[in-house]
């Protein structure tokens, strides 16, 4: 799948957390541990992010959850050697995006992550080289309207990911 993403010009994955990376909707109020939440990571998403990191693609988790410390701990448990490479943008009040881009949906989260990656790694990321994977149709629509590639993740159909990636190459 990574080869297909690279062939489509994708170098940055922005992935939603609730109901996309994990199979639960925490509503930003998970009271359990990161280890307990780790059991809810979808195998296909775990592998996609592992492969993306191995291929030196940029990765961010973009979420409306304010529980970014918990999400950071989940990424540390998932990828102990590479978790620090994953940017996390949630509604925790710890970041600000003041650019000219869209403020709808996950767009400011993505733009803020791109700013950090550009400063920290001299990353060359554009809207066309970005892929949002999210289970929320409105977030997907907001991305597409703004020229960002997007795949609507269907929680009960994990193969939608492979089909979505294949469709990127056809566009």
What is each residue range found by the language model?
Residues 13, 88-90, 129-135:
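Extended hydrophobic secondary-structure segments that form protein cores and membrane-embedded regions
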Residues 22-23, 55, 68-72, 96-97, ...:
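Short catalytic/ligand-binding loop motif for oxyanion handling, primarily in non-cytosolic enzymes
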Residues 30-33, 77-79, 148-150:
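Glycine-rich, phosphate-binding/catalytic loops in enzymes
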